[in-house]
Amino acid sequence: MPSTSRAGSLKDPDVAELFFRDDPEKLFSDLREIGHGSFGAVYFAHDARTSEVVAIKKMSYSGKQSNEKWQDIIKEVKFLQRIQHPNSIEYKGCYLREHTAWLVMEYCLGSASDLLEVHKKPLQEIEIAAITHGALQGLAYLHSHNLIHRDIKAGNILLTEPGQVKLADFGSASIVSPANSFVGTPYWMAPEVILAMDEGQYDGKVDVWSLGITCVELAERKPPLFNMNAMSALYHIAQNESPTLQSTEWSDYFRNFVDSCLHKIPQDRPTSDELLKHMFVLRERPETVLIDLIQRTKDAVRELDNLQYRKMKKLLFQEAHNGPAVETQEEDEEQEHGVGRTGTVNSIGSNQSIPSMSISASSQSSSVNSLPDASDDKSELDMMEGDHTVMSNSSVIHLKPEEENYPEEPDPRTRPSEPQSPPQVSRHKSHYRNREHFATIRTASLVTRQIQEHEQDSELREQMSGYKRMRRQHQKQLMALENKLKAEMDEHRLRLDKDLETQRNNFAAEIEKLVKKHQAAMEKELKLMANEEKKFQQHIQAQQKKELNSFLESQKREYKLRKEQLKEELNENQSTPKKEKQEWLSKQKENFQHFQAEEEANLLRRQRQYLELECRRFKRRMLLSRHNLEQDLVREELNKRQTQKDLEHAMLLRQHESMQELEFRHLNTIQRMRCELIKLQHQTELTNQLEYNKRRERELRRKHVMEVRQQPKSLKSKELQIKKQFQDTCKIQTRQYKALRNHLLKSTPKNEHKAVLKRLKEEQTRKLAILAEQYDHSINEMLSTQALRLDEAQEAECQVLKMQLQQELELLNAYQSKIKMQAEAQHEREIRELEQRVSLRRALLEQKIEEEMLALQNERTERIRSLLERQAREIEAFDSESMRLGFSNMILSNLSPEAFSHSYPGASGWSHNPTGGPGPHWGHPMAGPPQAWGHPMQGGPQPWGHPSGSVQGVSRGSTMGVRNSPQALRRTASGGRTEQGMSRSTSVTSQISNGSHMSYT
């Protein structure tokens, strides 16, 4: 539930279901106050529905800090609803009425501290073991559910009629473990709780420490440092050694158990589960040890209440017969009895810094619960008290069960002369019936004294409550600041992560855009290459067709010309017969036609070879051009990735610096606030100590003034006592004088009687004068002695008080100095740890950057390697195919763009790198341009009449054919392939990285 909700508001359904809506005043009757504390009061009551006896703890949530009180009530109710164990108090419900919460629980007889209060002596070891065992079982249950009680003491360990031990008062409990609140009762508080805000968190082992202190309390009637101011006790616990059992009569098991519980370092302290296995609680003991103890205590309570009753009857009887002027021995006796009953008060009270706590360890509850948790005597449940206590505003009349039914009946054992009481049997039945409803181990005087102290010591309680409130407020401020800075840090980290993610997304989009651009460029280039190849092939075919037509026309002309020449030759040679001429002419024509057919076939073959060769060359050049383009695109993409990675790493370093600066600023802010809060806390502690010193001195002065005022009465009493002694002496002397006179008168003659009487009279007068002088001297000596003794006693008390207060002030200064040193050491440690974390984070970041750069470089190398390998495989496959088709690599790679431009206009422009890269990709140019197809043979064939010309022409054609044959291609390529392969494999990465293309020539 949010702390800002109004106190008592039930709008939140989670809160509303914690409380019953019935009117508690109609459900519970016969309410009798049986305990009191800063939280409110505890009442005995009957449940009208079931006639069950219950205890009701009334807690107001109005007035100052109402919201905090309301939150504490909610927390306690939630805690009680969560627990269910035989050794924890049974919760029955909670009701709301007029800004007061009625917390209903099972009724118990009283607390372990009530046992000490009644018997005025420590418990036996087996009794302590039994109580401790039950408390440990309850603590083990709480700790197993990550719950912490935080206020274990004898006053919060209750006992039931069957001897069951119950843990009670969960107003200080914590629902989470570990916790870090300043909560508990000072004398029982563990060191880590006192230093919670300064040194960190604590867990259920704080209850183990409190249990150890409780064992000391049960063994010595009060906890350690109980004669010290509560605030001073806190400082002492925080910085001094752990307490131990003082007496040597206790067993080694008990001593070891207490020492184990009171280990100063929590890590060395055993858990509640481990302590359940300790021999101190496992040793064999009578099962009825607690039942017997409770019965003895109930009997003692009955006797004490009977004694009070008899005193009251005696006072009333004396007033009725002798008037109110009866003082002396009875009064003194009553005072002595009062001292006996409240021995803890009188023996400790003068040194007790918190008078409200000076009753006994049980009432000693300036419980430092977080605020109203501070149930002073949250013997909440002791609540559960005994004989009927009839409350009338501030007066309390505590009646025995018998007296409730027979108010005028005297005790037959102490007043035998009184009238006969009703039959004993009926009285026992009545007593049993009332005990069944309101059995208790608390005396009426304890309840009355508790209420009176609560009314009187509000100033001290308010000071402690204010100190606890301040500590809790400081903790809230520090937690609020830490949460604020944590939120700021998370927001800053999210912003940086968002910036980094945005940059990465932008980079990814840029890379994706670049890849798509490259894909489009590659597709465009492939289409362009296909078109260029088609155009190139068409251009060569058109040129060859033109050359073929020209060649055929030339052959026709040559044929016609040759035919005419042959005719002329035949006409000139008249001697040859006509038939022979015709035969010779036909044969010449046939030879010439055959020669022309061969020439045409050779031309077509050469054209086909040339077309295939040039197309193969063109394809190879296109392949190399595509490879160059791929290299350019890959290089551009890799360079882009490198640039992006550099920018990303620069941003990571900037973000690291930004986070480092923010972390140091936050740490400085927290440490500065912590120092301010410690300074304010120390100032408050010093102010409280000085106020406490003034109050102690004021109380001592008031006491001395009262002693001085009461001195005349005391002197008058002593003077009357001396006067009485003098009167007794005078009476004795008078009797002696009369006896001597009678004796002398009998033994002396009658005529001498007058002289004897005169002499005796003078002797008597002289002795009375001496006695009067002694009386005056005794009075004067008594007056001077008493005044001197009073002055000396008061001066000694002043000196003792000053020394004690000075020691407490020095203890406070030492504690504060230690806290300051610890805070400084903690701050230095935090700065050192932050520097280590930052440097480690920087080293990890630099390592990550280095790894990413190495991974990027490896990726770059792998991309280039795989690209070049793929391109090499493509070139090799192309060259293998070319070799299979009969083309040599040398021939394919020895065509210069200039030579190519003669036969293919526009090709030279295409041969340039499409991406603007370096020009020459194709290896070595050819030695010279190819001969025009229109002049296949220099000089032409010889006239048909000269066969040598034809032979020469054929030999040239055959030479051309041999040069273009697969065998020749293989021979020319055999010497250069290894060299080319080597040139491809060298400096692959550097060439692409530097922007140069690889040529596979």
Curated annotation (Swiss-Prot):
Residues 28-281 form the Protein kinase domain. Residues 375-388, 577-586 have a biased composition (Basic and acidic residues). Residues 458-651, 754-877 form a coiled coil. The keyword Coiled coil applies. One of its GO terms (molecular function) is ATP binding. Residues 324-435, 567-586, 911-1001 are annotated as: Disordered. GO terms for cellular component: cytoplasm. Residues 949-967, 975-1001 have a biased composition (Polar residues). It catalyses: L-seryl-[protein] + ATP = O-phospho-L-seryl-[protein] + ADP + H(+); L-threonyl-[protein] + ATP = O-phospho-L-threonyl-[protein] + ADP + H(+). Residues 350-370, 921-930 have a biased composition (Low complexity). It is found in: Cytoplasm. Serine/threonine-protein kinase involved in various processes such as p38/mapk14 stress-activated MAPK cascade, DNA damage response and regulation of cytoskeleton stability. Acts as an activator of the p38/MAPK14 stress-activated MAPK cascade by mediating phosphorylation and subsequent activation of upstream MAP kinase kinases. In response to DNA damage, involved in the G2/M transition DNA damage checkpoint by activating the p38/MAPK14 stress-activated MAPK cascade. Belongs to the protein kinase superfamily. STE Ser/Thr protein kinase family. STE20 subfamily. This is Serine/threonine-protein kinase TAO1-B. The lineage of its organism: Eukaryota, Metazoa, Chordata, Craniata, Vertebrata.
